């Protein structure tokens, strides 16, 4: 959606296909980090964005046993918004779609499920999709797969995926929030029987809770029963014990099967993958959506003029991968390190009271909080908007006076 918005703003004809009838999907990435908020500021949309209902996280804190530890302090970041904005992803996507519709070259088609790619010789020339009214084919000089970690586009393209072992999965669920609940701590490191860590995200009138569990332990937890699961969570966050009684059915608990992977090549002639379709990120740091947004900004910066002129080649697509791949590799390496040190080697196994190594380092060397804030809030290569918004007379011009698509 962000790439579609940026390209339409720059005068490129865009069709965005969304599989569902709306953007309402619970437990999607619901955090926008300072680097993403800086992009919104550069687009002149920050004031409108901040009017949307959201909460602001200005530091990340964790509870290790009964000790509160500040993990990251965003106050020194060199950006306008020194906080993480907690906002439902459907609100953000609707926000982008609403602003995208200001541009005549932006089209959004809902309930359009991409099922296959259209090939002409050795290049990708479009997609086939199904809708409630039937199948259709959309031709384009460039197909962008931004359809997530279970990407149909990358699967149909036959792109090679490099997979990395991950020791965790996550159960996501809601806990009603009470007025006397303590101030938000991002993570609770209190050993449970199977839950290694509990993430609590403030959503205003409820907590979005993520129970980090050993990889593949979901069936075992289900077999023990929902009451046992509620009790384990209540031992980690006693203040939520009464609210947890409302968790009455496993249908209210969604399993995220965590994986970390990336494509060896993000592109084919006529095709580019970005975001989770190109590189599935770990939930460590909650930065997946922000990495995807940075991909979109970089792709728009590198491709807008070529697309407007109808001259995009595979070298141009390769340039997008070159621009973004180093940051993705470094981010995944840090995430894998944290996963292995925090979740695999004793941060919450039964009977383990040890403090994870990364937490011990932050406690011993407080200046590390700034580095953690930089990693979470900015990433290794924050992108900036280089495309220019074309004047109204271009967008309002007759088709014959516009550059070729």
Language-model features, listed with the residues they occupy:
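Active-site-adjacent segment of FAD-dependent monooxygenases/related oxidoreductases
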Residues: 33-101, 121
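Generic enzyme active-site microenvironment
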Residues: 16-17, 145, 188, 274
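Glycine-rich FAD pyrophosphate-binding loop
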Residues: 5-28
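C-terminal helical "tail/cap" subdomain of flavin- and related membrane-associated enzymes
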Residues: 301-405
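Glycine-rich phosphate/pyrophosphate-binding beta-alpha loops
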Residues: 258-263, 278-290, 326
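Conserved FAD-binding catalytic core of PHBH/FMO-like flavoproteins
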Residues: 112, 123-137, 142-254, 258, ...
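FAD-binding beta-loop-beta segment adjacent to the flavin cofactor pocket
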Residues: 256-273, 329-330, 347
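A conserved beta-strand/loop element that lines the FAD pocket in flavoprotein oxidoreductases
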Residues: 100-115
């Amino acid at each position: 959606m962000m790439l579609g918005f940026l390209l339409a703003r720059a005068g490129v004809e865009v069709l965005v296909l969304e599989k569902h009838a709306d953007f309402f999907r619970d437990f999607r990435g619901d955090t926008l980090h300072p680097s993403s908020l800086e992009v919104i500021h550069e687009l002149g949309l920050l004031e409108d964005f901040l009017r949307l209902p959201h909460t602001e996280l200005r530091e990340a804190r964790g509870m290790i046993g009964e000790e509160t530890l500040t993990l990251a302090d965003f106050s020194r970041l060199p950006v306008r918004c020194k906080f993480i904005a907690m906002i439902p992803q459907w609100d953000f996507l609707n926000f982008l779609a609403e602003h995208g519709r200001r541009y005549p070259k932006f089209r959004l088609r809902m309930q359009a499920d991409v099922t296959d790619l259209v090939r002409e010789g050795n290049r990708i020339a479009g997609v086939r999709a199904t809708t409630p009214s039937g199948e259709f084919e959309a031709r384009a000089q460039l197909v962008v797969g931004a359809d997530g970690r279970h990407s149909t586009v990358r699967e149909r393209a036959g792109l090679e995926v490099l997979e990395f072992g991950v020791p965790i999965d996550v159960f996501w669920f809601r806990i009603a929030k009470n007025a006397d609940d303590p101030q938000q701590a991002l993570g609770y490191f209190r050993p449970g029987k199977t839950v290694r860590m509990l993430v609590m995200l403030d959503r205003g009138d409820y907590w979005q809770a993520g129970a980090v569990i050993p990889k593949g332990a979901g069936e075992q937890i289900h077999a023990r029963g929902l009451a046992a699961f509620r009790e384990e969570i209540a031992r980690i966050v006693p203040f939520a014990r009464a609210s947890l009684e409302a968790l009455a059915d496993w249908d209210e608990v969604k399993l995220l099967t965590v994986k970390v992977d990336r494509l060896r090549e993000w592109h084919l002639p006529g095709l580019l993958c970005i975001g989770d379709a190109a590189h599935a990120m770990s939930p460590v740091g909650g930065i997946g959506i922000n990495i995807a947004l940075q991909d979109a900004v970089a792709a728009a910066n590198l491709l807008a003029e070529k697309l407007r002129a109808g001259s995009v080649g595979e070298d141009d697509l390769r340039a997008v991968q070159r621009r973004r791949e180093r940051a993705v590799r470094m981010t995944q390496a840090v995430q894998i390190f944290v996963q292995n040190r925090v979740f695999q080697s004793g941060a919450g196994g039964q009977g383990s009271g040890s403090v994870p190594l990364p937490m011990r380092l932050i406690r011993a060397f407080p200046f590390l909080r700034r580095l953690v804030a930089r990693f979470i809030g900015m990433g290794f290569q924050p992108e900036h908007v280089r495309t220019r918004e074309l004047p109204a007379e271009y967008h309002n011009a007759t088709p014959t006076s516009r550059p070729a698509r």
